[in-house]
């Protein structure tokens, strides 16, 4: 079993992210635009889906 503090830390780096709908880039949770040029720095972001 994984420790709760480690689980929270891992979740911060792996789960609490935003995803670009056009190029699927993994972005910080508070991002407003994508950082990638190939999708034109679009603002179409979604939160990363949570584990069940």
UniProtKB/Swiss-Prot annotation:
Keywords: Cytoplasm, Ribonucleoprotein, Ribosomal protein, Zinc. It comes from the Eukaryota. It is found in: Cytoplasm. GO terms for cellular component: cytoplasm; ribonucleoprotein complex; ribosome. Pfam families: Ribosomal_L40e. One of its GO terms (molecular function) is structural constituent of ribosome. The keyword Protease does not apply. This is Large ribosomal subunit protein eL40. It comes from Candida albicans (strain SC5314 / ATCC MYA-2876).
